[in-house]
């Protein structure tokens, strides 16, 4: 992404995951599906990094958190919508051999539509073009945008007097020394917390509810209802993201998750579980928005933005490969499902302390100021 540009990267990874999803939908057996799932994960994992990190270059520092949160708000409606589709498919009696294939085809078609819109409408990041020494191309894009603004407002924009500065190209090794090393560590920890907590709840909630005596339809319904906390939480985050310092925001959200995790684990009735799961999801997805859409993507210089954000996301994903084994062990122990919620709380506390001690402040700073690591 740092080499070929933001727009080309988005389209490349869209194509990869679209092909993989269509291939998965028509897979003749589980082994072919494994292969397509692997390719799909590669495409989607890379796409998330490019989308969120690249977007920070298109908006000003004073309200970057709000706009990034709005992006996340729209995107995270996918979770309750997908669970709603799954619930409908299960209850309508579509065969097991077809229901998951339908789940694959729906987002693949939507992704094709999104790719066409991106190809036609999204300009390349002027900041990335400038970092590559392609100043004339960057100027042409911004000039076009300025003319559109002047035409819509009827007012001329002030002239630009600042000359373009030479952008220092940073090697990949720069992530592991000097000021960037601290950001690499903090970003990795922030996303380890996000992945382990978010995916534990998403992946294990139906199984946890089933272990508590609820049937498949009941657990699917409760999970779907709880996941409406996702867009609600991100909507709240979009309203306050640029009003609270980034470090403080992270610590508050992690503390809320720790408390709500313990409370949720103590509930025994369906109504109480739905309410507490909704509140827990609200806090979790406020943190997801904070971590994946705002804080980690914005803490890097332009020439290392996708490298840094990509590395931290990779570490977060790797932790999520191994964490389910710990969850399985805890769930099988004496505390059962309650132990899983306690585990979520412990992870939240540990990450919160790390952000409080080592976190860097980026709220309101321009991309250029954040990128000054000399």
Question: What does each model-found stretch correspond to?
Answer:
Residues 1-374:
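Transmembrane-helix signature of 12-pass secondary carriers
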């Amino acid at each position: 992404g740092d080499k070929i540009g933001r727009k080309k990267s988005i389209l490349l990874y869209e194509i990869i995951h679209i092909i993989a999803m269509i291939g998965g939908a028509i897979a003749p057996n589980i082994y072919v599906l494994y292969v397509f799932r692997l390719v799909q994960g590669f495409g989607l994992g890379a796409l998330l990094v490019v989308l969120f990190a690249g977007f920070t270059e298109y908006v000003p520092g004073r309200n970057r958190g709000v706009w990034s949160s709005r992006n996340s708000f729209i995107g995270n409606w996918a979770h309750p919508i997908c669970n709603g589709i799954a619930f409908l498919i299960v209850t309508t009696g579509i065969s097991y051999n077809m229901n998951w294939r339908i789940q694959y085809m729906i987002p693949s078609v939507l992704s094709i539509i999104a790719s066409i819109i991106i190809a036609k409408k999204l300009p390349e990041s002027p900041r990335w073009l400038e970092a590559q020494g392609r100043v004339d191309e960057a100027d042409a894009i911004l000039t076009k945008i300025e003319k559109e603004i002047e035409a819509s407002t009827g007012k001329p924009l002030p002239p630009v007097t600042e000359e373009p500065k030479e952008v220092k190209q940073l090697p990949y090794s720069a992530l592991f020394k000097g000021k960037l090393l601290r950001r690499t560590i903090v970003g990795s920890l922030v996303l380890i917390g996000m992945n382990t907590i978010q995916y534990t709840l998403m992946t294990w909630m139906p199984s946890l509810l089933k272990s508590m005596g609820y049937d498949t339809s009941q657990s699917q319904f409760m999970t779907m209802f709880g996941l409406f906390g996702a867009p609600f939480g991100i909507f709240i985050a979009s309203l306050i993201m640029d009003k609270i310092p980034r470090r403080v925001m992270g610590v508050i959200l992690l503390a809320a998750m720790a408390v709500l995790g313990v409370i949720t684990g103590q509930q025994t009735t369906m109504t109480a579980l739905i309410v507490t799961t909704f509140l827990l999801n609200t806090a979790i997805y406020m943190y997801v928005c904070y971590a994946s859409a705002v804080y980690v993507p914005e803490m890097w210089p332009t020439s290392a933005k996708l490298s840094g954000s990509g590395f931290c996301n990779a570490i977060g994903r790797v932790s999520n490969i191994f964490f389910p084994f710990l969850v399985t062990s805890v769930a099988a122990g004496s505390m059962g499902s309650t132990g899983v919620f306690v585990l979520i709380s412990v992870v939240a506390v540990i990450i919160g302390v790390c952000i409080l001690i080592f976190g860097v402040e980026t709220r309101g700073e321009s991309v250029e100021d954040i990128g000054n690591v000399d």
